[in-house]
From Swiss-Prot:
The keyword Transferase does not apply. NCBIfam families: rplV_bact (TIGR01044). Belongs to the universal ribosomal protein uL22 family. InterPro entries: Ribosomal_uL22, Ribosomal_uL22_bac/chlpt-type, Ribosomal_uL22_bac/org-type, Ribosomal_uL22_CS, Ribosomal_uL22_sf. Transmembrane segments: none annotated. It comes from the Bacteria. GO terms for biological process: translation. SUPFAM superfamilies: Ribosomal protein L22. This is Large ribosomal subunit protein uL22. Keywords: Ribonucleoprotein, Ribosomal protein, RNA-binding, rRNA-binding. It comes from Thermotoga petrophila (strain ATCC BAA-488 / DSM 13995 / JCM 10881 / RKU-1). Part of the 50S ribosomal subunit.
Amino acid sequence: MKLQVPRSSLKRSIFHKKRKELLSSLPKIEAKAVARYIRISPRKARAIANTIRGKSVEEAFQILAFSPKKAARIMEKVLKSAVANAENNFGLSVENLYVSECYVNDGPRMKRIWPRGRGRADIIQKRMSHITIVVRDRSKEDEYRKALEELEKKISSEE
Protein backbone atom coordinates (compact mmCIF):
# COMPACT_ATOMS: atom_id res chain seq x y z
CA MET A 1 0.00 0.00 0.00
CA LYS A 2 1.48 3.33 -1.12
CA LEU A 3 0.82 6.35 1.08
CA GLN A 4 -0.74 9.37 -0.59
CA VAL A 5 1.39 12.46 -0.03
CA PRO A 6 -0.68 15.69 0.13
CA ARG A 7 -0.22 18.17 -2.73
CA SER A 8 -0.15 21.46 -0.80
CA SER A 9 3.26 22.36 0.61
CA LEU A 10 2.01 23.06 4.17
CA LYS A 11 0.11 19.77 4.44
CA ARG A 12 3.06 17.95 2.87
CA SER A 13 5.52 19.35 5.44
CA ILE A 14 3.17 18.40 8.32
CA PHE A 15 2.73 14.92 6.78
CA HIS A 16 6.48 14.37 6.54
CA LYS A 17 7.10 15.65 10.10
CA LYS A 18 4.47 13.27 11.50
CA ARG A 19 5.83 10.41 9.42
CA LYS A 20 9.38 11.11 10.62
CA GLU A 21 8.27 11.19 14.28
CA LEU A 22 6.36 7.94 13.90
CA LEU A 23 9.23 6.23 12.04
CA SER A 24 11.59 7.12 14.89
CA SER A 25 9.33 5.12 17.24
CA LEU A 26 9.97 1.90 15.26
CA PRO A 27 12.35 -0.67 16.79
CA LYS A 28 15.98 -0.30 15.66
CA ILE A 29 17.17 -3.34 13.75
CA GLU A 30 20.22 -2.08 11.87
CA ALA A 31 23.54 -0.37 12.49
CA LYS A 32 25.92 1.26 10.05
CA ALA A 33 29.63 2.02 9.80
CA VAL A 34 31.41 4.09 7.15
CA ALA A 35 35.09 4.43 6.30
CA ARG A 36 35.73 7.44 4.09
CA TYR A 37 38.71 8.55 1.98
CA ILE A 38 40.36 5.13 2.04
CA ARG A 39 43.35 4.87 -0.32
CA ILE A 40 42.26 1.84 -2.30
CA SER A 41 40.72 1.54 -5.73
CA PRO A 42 36.91 1.22 -5.53
CA ARG A 43 37.01 -1.52 -8.16
CA LYS A 44 39.30 -3.68 -6.01
CA ALA A 45 37.29 -2.99 -2.85
CA ARG A 46 33.99 -3.87 -4.56
CA ALA A 47 35.24 -7.38 -5.27
CA ILE A 48 35.55 -8.00 -1.52
CA ALA A 49 32.27 -6.18 -0.74
CA ASN A 50 30.40 -8.51 -3.10
CA THR A 51 31.72 -11.60 -1.30
CA ILE A 52 30.43 -10.63 2.17
CA ARG A 53 27.08 -9.06 1.24
CA GLY A 54 24.17 -11.11 2.64
CA LYS A 55 26.38 -13.32 4.83
CA SER A 56 26.12 -13.65 8.62
CA VAL A 57 28.62 -11.55 10.56
CA GLU A 58 30.62 -14.60 11.72
CA GLU A 59 30.84 -15.94 8.17
CA ALA A 60 31.86 -12.51 6.84
CA PHE A 61 34.66 -12.27 9.42
CA GLN A 62 35.95 -15.70 8.35
CA ILE A 63 35.89 -14.75 4.66
CA LEU A 64 37.76 -11.51 5.38
CA ALA A 65 40.31 -13.19 7.66
CA PHE A 66 41.37 -15.66 4.96
CA SER A 67 41.41 -13.20 2.07
CA PRO A 68 44.91 -11.99 1.06
CA LYS A 69 43.58 -8.67 -0.30
CA LYS A 70 44.33 -5.26 1.22
CA ALA A 71 40.63 -4.37 0.97
CA ALA A 72 39.77 -7.31 3.24
CA ARG A 73 41.76 -5.79 6.14
CA ILE A 74 39.92 -2.48 5.73
CA MET A 75 36.50 -4.14 5.41
CA GLU A 76 37.22 -6.17 8.55
CA LYS A 77 37.75 -2.95 10.54
CA VAL A 78 34.57 -1.39 9.17
CA LEU A 79 32.58 -4.56 9.90
CA LYS A 80 33.91 -4.62 13.49
CA SER A 81 32.81 -1.01 13.87
CA ALA A 82 29.31 -1.77 12.51
CA VAL A 83 28.95 -4.73 14.91
CA ALA A 84 30.12 -2.57 17.84
CA ASN A 85 27.59 0.12 16.85
CA ALA A 86 24.82 -2.50 16.77
CA GLU A 87 25.77 -3.83 20.21
CA ASN A 88 26.43 -0.57 22.03
CA ASN A 89 23.95 1.82 20.42
CA PHE A 90 20.96 -0.46 19.79
CA GLY A 91 21.53 -3.48 22.04
CA LEU A 92 21.39 -5.99 19.18
CA SER A 93 22.89 -9.46 19.68
CA VAL A 94 25.87 -10.40 17.49
CA GLU A 95 24.62 -13.95 16.80
CA ASN A 96 21.59 -12.67 14.84
CA LEU A 97 23.41 -10.03 12.78
CA TYR A 98 24.05 -10.30 9.05
CA VAL A 99 25.54 -7.94 6.45
CA SER A 100 22.44 -6.47 4.81
CA GLU A 101 24.27 -3.80 2.79
CA CYS A 102 27.89 -3.51 1.81
CA TYR A 103 28.86 -1.05 -0.88
CA VAL A 104 31.85 0.97 -2.05
CA ASN A 105 31.50 4.44 -3.55
CA ASP A 106 34.14 6.47 -5.36
CA GLY A 107 36.00 9.06 -3.32
CA PRO A 108 38.09 11.91 -4.69
CA ARG A 109 41.08 11.18 -6.92
CA MET A 110 44.61 12.38 -6.41
CA LYS A 111 46.26 13.22 -9.72
CA ARG A 112 49.97 12.60 -10.15
CA ILE A 113 52.23 13.29 -13.12
CA TRP A 114 54.22 10.45 -14.68
CA PRO A 115 57.03 11.75 -16.95
CA ARG A 116 57.23 10.10 -20.37
CA GLY A 117 59.55 10.36 -23.34
CA ARG A 118 59.95 13.42 -25.59
CA GLY A 119 58.87 15.87 -22.89
CA ARG A 120 55.38 14.47 -22.48
CA ALA A 121 53.62 13.48 -19.26
CA ASP A 122 50.78 11.14 -18.33
CA ILE A 123 48.38 11.72 -15.46
CA ILE A 124 48.12 8.88 -12.95
CA GLN A 125 44.92 8.85 -10.91
CA LYS A 126 45.25 7.54 -7.37
CA ARG A 127 41.72 6.59 -6.40
CA MET A 128 39.99 6.70 -3.01
CA SER A 129 36.94 4.83 -1.73
CA HIS A 130 34.11 5.34 0.71
CA ILE A 131 33.18 1.96 2.24
CA THR A 132 29.78 1.48 3.92
CA ILE A 133 28.59 -1.61 5.78
CA VAL A 134 25.10 -1.99 7.28
CA VAL A 135 24.38 -4.92 9.61
CA ARG A 136 20.83 -6.00 10.43
CA ASP A 137 19.23 -8.22 13.08
CA ARG A 138 17.44 -11.20 11.48
CA SER A 139 15.40 -12.04 14.59
CA LYS A 140 13.75 -8.60 14.77
CA GLU A 141 12.87 -8.18 11.07
CA ASP A 142 9.35 -9.66 11.38
CA GLU A 143 8.64 -7.47 14.41
CA TYR A 144 9.88 -4.43 12.45
CA ARG A 145 7.76 -5.29 9.39
CA LYS A 146 4.60 -5.65 11.51
CA ALA A 147 5.28 -2.35 13.30
CA LEU A 148 5.81 -0.64 9.94
CA GLU A 149 2.51 -1.98 8.55
CA GLU A 150 0.64 -0.77 11.66
CA LEU A 151 2.32 2.61 11.32
CA GLU A 152 1.28 2.95 7.66
CA LYS A 153 -2.32 2.06 8.60
CA LYS A 154 -2.21 4.69 11.35
CA ILE A 155 -0.85 7.36 9.01
CA SER A 156 -3.36 6.60 6.23
CA SER A 157 -6.30 6.60 8.70
CA GLU A 158 -5.37 10.06 10.05
CA GLU A 159 -5.80 11.72 6.65
